[in-house]
């Protein structure tokens, strides 16, 4: 996707916020526990390469990604020796590509190891489905058979074992405790404990320090976003959001009563009013469901009116403004703010989706 550097719409990523979130998390971790920065999905919309650089500078000991391509992008960007784990499925035919690039892969079923011919050592993390229901082995017997298969092949290394909690971002912990018990039972069935045992995502690492094990996977909270609104008031430290989204008015005009705007003419002025056109649309991740949501203009709320277009959006202004006036879609302005949580609540989704939706057509500028 082409990045729109010649359009007045941009994202600002606060390096200091990411560093502070990492440092605050590290301060509560035992010295032996590594923090791995989760930078999948273009670092949750924050930009994978630059975010990885910031995280490394802040003390992250490795990275987690969703797909092999993301891991290879990190290697190509200069992260030559850092630990990188692919959390999602890797095709068997790509096992040697991962091995040659010293990228750790997730194995979650026995047959993936069948007839695997390796040209370099492959580091494997065994995924346990303790209750998430996506990927993973589910019994002690499976774990033992996989451990035996790996032990026989001198090119395979059982480097880690892990699971993922379905309800770590909830205050009620009974299901979490069931998952933990199941994982520990499977872990205890192994003859040799792998180098890395890891279970904690952002929510678990913030609320359940007893399960830090050897490493944590620090994702959404590295970016200053709360894993869920339910636990927002139970966090051990304040999270600092790193992402802000801005644009500028490219056209300002006064509507007369009866004038309509955008596709379908779904919005019609009932009195004289000022509106502005913004150069951002659903192709940038400002999806059509944002219609009716508000942005900030010099600290004042301005609603999005009519249907959001692929490349443009129209807002109703509290009064006349000049073309070129800055508009805050996510971020702070004149003492007021619009957050990813605000957007998520309006859209009926989660803050993860709000930032992940922001496409690479919007340039990222890194500040502080």
Swiss-Prot record:
GO BP term, pick one: peptidoglycan biosynthetic process
Binding annotation for substrate: 134, 310
Could you give a GO molecular-function term held by this entry?
pyridoxal phosphate binding
Q: Pathway it belongs to?
A: Amino-acid biosynthesis; D-alanine biosynthesis; D-alanine from L-alanine: step 1/1
**Cofactor names:** pyridoxal 5'-phosphate
Q: Which residues form the active site?
A: 40, 263
- Per the record, the domain of life is Bacteria
**Reactions it catalyzes:** L-alanine = D-alanine
Task performed by this protein = Catalyzes the interconversion of L-alanine and D-alanine. May also act on other amino acids.
* Family to which this protein belongs: Belongs to the alanine racemase family.
Q: What name is this protein filed under?
A: Alanine racemase
Tell me the organism: Listeria innocua serovar 6a (strain ATCC BAA-680 / CLIP 11262)
């Amino acid at each position: 996707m082409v990045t729109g550097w010649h359009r007045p719409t941009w994202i600002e990523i606060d390096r200091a916020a990411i560093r502070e979130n990492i440092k605050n998390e590290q301060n509560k971790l035992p010295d032996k526990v590594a923090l791995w920065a989760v930078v999948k999905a273009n670092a949750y919309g924050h930009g994978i390469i630059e975010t990885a650089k910031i995280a490394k500078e802040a003390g992250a000991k490795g990275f987690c990604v969703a797909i092999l391509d993301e891991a290879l992008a990190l290697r190509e960007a200069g992260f030559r020796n850092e630990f990188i784990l692919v959390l999602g499925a890797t095709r068997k035919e790509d096992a040697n590509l991962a091995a040659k690039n010293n990228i750790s892969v997730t194995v979650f079923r026995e047959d993936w190891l069948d007839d695997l011919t390796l040209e370099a050592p492959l580091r494997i993390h065994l995924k346990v489905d303790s209750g998430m229901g996506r990927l993973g082995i589910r019994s002690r017997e499976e774990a033992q058979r996989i451990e035996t298969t790996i032990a026989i092949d001198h090119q395979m290394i059982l480097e880690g074992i892990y699971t993922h909690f379905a309800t770590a971002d909830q205050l009620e912990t009974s299901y979490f405790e069931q998952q933990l018990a199941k994982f520990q039972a499977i872990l205890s069935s192994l003859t040799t404990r792998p180098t890395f045992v890891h279970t904690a995502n952002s929510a678990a690492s913030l609320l359940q320090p007893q399960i830090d094990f050897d490493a944590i996977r620090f994702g959404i909270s590295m970016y200053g976003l709360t894993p869920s609104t339910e636990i927002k008031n139970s966090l051990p430290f304040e999270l600092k959001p790193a992402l802000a989204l801005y644009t500028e008015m490219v056209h300002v005009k006064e509507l007369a009563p009866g004038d309509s705007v955008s596709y379908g003419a779904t919005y019609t002025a009932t009195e004289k009013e000022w509106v502005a056109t913004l150069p951002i649309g659903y192709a940038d991740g400002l999806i059509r469901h944002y219609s009716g949501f508000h942005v900030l203009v010099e600290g004042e709320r301005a609603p999005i009116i009519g249907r959001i277009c692929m490349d443009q959006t129209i807002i109703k202004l509290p009064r006349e403004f000049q073309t070129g006036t800055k508009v805050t879609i996510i971020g702070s302005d004149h003492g007021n703010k619009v957050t990813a949580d605000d957007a998520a609540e309006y859209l009926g989704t989660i803050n993860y989706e709000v930032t992940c939706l922001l496409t690479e057509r919007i340039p990222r500028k890194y500040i502080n």
